């Protein structure tokens, strides 16, 4: 990043009239190339692909993450991707956080992209997640709040007062409970950034392993939150038939379940 034609340190305070040049950053992002990165392709045809994303993989290139993203892998492994989101996010209709694993649908052409985006906007695309959270969740329920950027920490999202954020709607169902933990199914009715992570923390049941929203020390030696996009239902853009995809929990997720099942 150049300011008035000169390189500056990260802590430089901008002044009125400063000219900022981001050309070098943009060029580096746009120069991302296909990379031979193995990915789990659950399904694909000429219109869509459904991917089981692994934990730790960023979905698309951005500043500080130019390589090793899902987009780099998609560019190598698929024959075509939609262009609606440009060269930085080809094919990407919705996202999963870096440390959230599971199912994600990709558009292979622009017609499919429009259809899938409309389904998400109209809430006809059903997205089901499983998570292990702290504490015993006693009943099923739903959370409807406003979510926006946390005014105290710009890296986080937060529940805000009415009118200060965007509406976020999550339905949750208790699958199993242990002494101090619960396995919970979450259904997204909206798709706000970090929505499930924020809502679970808001109900005082933060997700195990969530380094951003869970202040408690994790006891299970994890690399990230135990949040997995387990089930995805959509209408195929061309055939107009309903399709449902489901994937197994990752090994590290199953490991924690086994530990809890065998704990006294």
Per-range role (PLM):
Residues 1-264:
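RNA pseudouridine synthases
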């Amino acid at each position: 990043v150049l300011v008035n034609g000169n390189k500056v340190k990260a802590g430089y305070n901008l002044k009125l009239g400063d000219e900022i040049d981001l050309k070098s950053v943009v060029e580096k992002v746009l120069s991302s190339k296909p990379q031979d990165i193995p990915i789990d392709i659950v399904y694909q045809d000429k219109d869509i692909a459904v991917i089981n994303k692994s934990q730790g993989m960023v979905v698309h290139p951005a500043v500080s993450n130019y390589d090793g993203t899902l987009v780099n892998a998609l560019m190598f492994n698929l024959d075509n991707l939609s262009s609606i989101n440009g060269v930085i996010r080809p094919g990407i209709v919705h996202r999963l956080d870096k440390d959230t694993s599971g199912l994600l649908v990709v558009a292979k052409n622009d017609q499919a992209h429009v259809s899938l985006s409309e389904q998400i906007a109209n809430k006809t695309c059903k997205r089901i997640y499983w998570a292990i959270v702290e504490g015993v969740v006693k009943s099923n329920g739903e959370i409807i709040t406003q979510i926006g950027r946390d005014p105290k920490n710009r890296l986080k999202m937060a529940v805000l007062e009415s009118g200060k954020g965007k509406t976020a709607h999550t339905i949750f169902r208790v699958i199993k409970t242990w002494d101090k933990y619960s396995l919970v199914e979450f259904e997204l009715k909206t798709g706000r950034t970090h929505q499930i992570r924020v809502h679970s923390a808001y109900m005082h049941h933060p997700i195990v392993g969530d380094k951003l929203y869970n202040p408690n020390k994790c006891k299970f030696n994890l690399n990230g939150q135990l949040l997995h996009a387990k089930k995805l239902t959509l209408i195929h853009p061309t055939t107009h038939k309903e399709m449902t995809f489901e994937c197994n929990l990752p090994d590290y997720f199953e490991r924690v379940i086994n530990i809890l099942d065998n704990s006294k």
